[in-house]
Amino acid sequence: MHRREVHVVIGAGVAGCLSAITRSRAGYQVVVLERESARSAGTYPVCTQTSNIVSENHSGAEYPFDPRSARDCLDGRIENERFFPELIYGGKTYSRIIASRSMMDDGHDIVGQCRANMRVIQSHYADRRAQDPADAVFGDPADICREIPTVPGVHDVAAAFLTPQRGMNPVLVSTVLDWELRSAGVDFREGSTVTSVTHRADGRYEVAYRGADGTPETVVADQVSLCAATAAFGMAKRLNPSIVFPKLFLALREILYVDLPDGTDKNFTCLKLEDSYGGMLSPLNNACAMIYHPPAAHIMNLVMDPETCAFPDEYVHYLAEGHPEKEKRAEWTLDRLREFYPELRRSTILGTYLKVAINTVSDSRVRRNMGVFDVRPGCTMSVLPKWTMCAVNARKEVTLALEHSVASGRLSADEARELAGHAMRPCLETLPAWAGDPQSITARAAAHAVNMNVPQVLAQRFAPPHAESASSRGTV
């Protein structure tokens, strides 16, 4: 690189963290501006918003009504398998996708839908494997999906399906990202509220922000990455008024953490389909779980203003002050899921969280990747409709950054190709000492739980699962 470029990444959710890590690995000088401040000493405040209640690395199996959603999620799952370490799963194994008996009894062939979707997943994985042998991360295509008649300890099951889908622990994800940010030498500026991003006549960008002490600051960047979730759309629109986004639906949802006083025999997520017939039980360890029941969780769904791309005032209020139905909906969720999952019989609610899910359709059963937006030369925007797509989008984003450097004469095309591969090398490729010490892992994860405002019990893990053979996932 003829001159080391300065890149500013706005936002430190999972998209922003991956943008910063991959850009820094590619040789750029990276500054992260994150609004939140750490509450635990020696940590960065990463994944403190929506990412604090994401616990599933989707394979597409939960979207049996939309093959494109299934393929998008599987693409993400493959990339994540190559990028993230085993540590993020906290001892969890493959999720169970459960077709509800009551849904079948009411005339909805959810089992048939799931079987058809398994074929979509197998076919797409076979195509990916044929295109690039490095994508064969789950073995033979015939072995990645399996139907089983039931899931012990779950009620109202018509059939269940094992796929590469796998639950992960959000505080362990933050622990890994924090380490990688530091290892990459990222300049992380917490407590920084961005006030404006302007494009300069020389092609660079001026980013104005208020520092942690309230002092106005500016940084001039060669390139900018907009990763501040829903706020990124408005930033992009101001930088490029002619940019066109798809129609965007913003769904306000409620997710719960609960305790498990009786423990659980499930070191895997149960995703019971569909809508009023089901819900998610995602144990993070033997002591707590994340739960979700769609009718109770889905509070509102608004369309983003296509002209201003402003975040709805109602959501600003609810996220800051809470929703008036928050407690009622939480009890509704717990009461309903007790009918399916006996380990919730004596559970109590540890925390109730509101999040905004972004989608390009109003139907939550469809979740397609929006990709990375090329806002203008040297400025990208990455917003995730699904956590699973984070590494796919990070690869695309760092590729666009390198292409801009080539176009600007700062890199050769050969250099860019080499740096792109280096940028996407696996996390924890060289295992640090703390990652081999269970107590150190727990301590680091607990510190991030404080930052993320989630129960510290999340820092506990299941015992490591036994290695699963291909036959344990294979088609019956």
List each model region and its residues.
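Dinucleotide-binding Rossmann-like beta1-alpha1 core, especially the glycine-rich loop
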Residues: 52-147
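Active-site lid/adjacent beta-loop-alpha segment flanking the redox-cofactor pocket in flavoenzymes
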Residues: 268-366
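N-terminal Rossmann-like FAD-binding beta1-loop-alpha1 element of flavoenzymes
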Residues: 5-31
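Helical element adjacent to the flavin cofactor pocket in flavoenzyme catalytic cores
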Residues: 157-223, 227-234, 390-400
